[in-house]
């Protein structure tokens, strides 16, 4: 990934309503290469909604988003089918993206080698979460949008993800993540909803 000085994402004046209730108004942010922004707020404050908006999955009621960088989105649902093994899951995504990344190396990096051929219905929540994050390594995209990335991860899983995140930031990538507990996360800035 080539390091650039242009923002990987910028947003201004964002507003969103849920029914008649204003979740947030006037939110703005700029994300440069190597930065990590954490979205904070109580349950129901709109963190996931804002992330989905930044990913282009929903539209704001007001405001503008410039997202010149290709991005990865990892939400609450891992997207792994019950019959799909981690190896098959990654192979399908690799084919869809035209990736030549080593699936075996990625499985090893996220401690999924022993579970590589276990159907999704039998994986633990942490194994499913790590499988979802393995997709991040299939194709280099500078911008990662992560919804509660540490959910279901034990201490070892969190350490593995921290290493993946640190490597991404070191190479000029950037991250926006919603989190309740950002301990150990390389926070550049916070947005509180």
Curated annotation (Swiss-Prot):
It catalyses: heme b(in) + ATP + H2O = heme b(out) + ADP + phosphate + H(+). Residues 9-191 form the ABC transporter domain. It is found in: Cell inner membrane. Its EC number is 7.6.2.5. It is an enzyme of class 7 (translocase). Gene3D superfamilies: P-loop containing nucleotide triphosphate hydrolases. It holds the Pfam family ABC_tran. GO terms for molecular function: ABC-type heme transporter activity; ATP binding; ATP hydrolysis activity. GO terms for biological process: cytochrome complex assembly. It is a peripheral membrane protein. Transmembrane segments: none annotated. SUPFAM superfamilies: P-loop containing nucleoside triphosphate hydrolases. Belongs to the ABC transporter superfamily. CcmA exporter (TC 3.A.1.107) family. PANTHER family: ABC TRANSPORTER I FAMILY MEMBER 1. This is Cytochrome c biogenesis ATP-binding export protein CcmA.
């Amino acid at each position: 990934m080539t390091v650039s000085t242009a923002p990987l994402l910028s947003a201004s004046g964002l507003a969103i309503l849920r029914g008649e209730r204003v979740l947030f108004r006037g939110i703005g942010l700029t994300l440069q290469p190597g930065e990590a922004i954490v979205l904070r707020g109580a349950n129901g404050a709109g963190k996931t909604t804002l992330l989905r908006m930044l990913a282009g999955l929903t539209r704001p009621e007001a405001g503008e988003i410039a997202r010149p960088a290709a991005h990865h989105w990892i939400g609450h649902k891992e997207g792994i089918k019950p019959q799909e093994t981690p190896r098959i899951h990654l192979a399908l995504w690799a084919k869809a993206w035209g990736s030549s990344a080593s699936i075996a190396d990625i499985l090893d990096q996220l401690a999924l080698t022993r579970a590589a051929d276990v159907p999704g219905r039998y994986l633990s929540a942490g194994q499913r979460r790590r499988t979802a994050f393995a997709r991040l390594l299939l194709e280099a995209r500078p911008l990662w949008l992560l919804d509660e990335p540490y959910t279901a991860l034990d201490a070892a899983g969190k350490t593995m993800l921290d290493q993946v995140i640190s490597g991404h930031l070191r190479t000029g990538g950037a991250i926006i993540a919603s989190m309740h507990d950002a301990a150990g996360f390389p926070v550049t800035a916070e947005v509180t909803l």
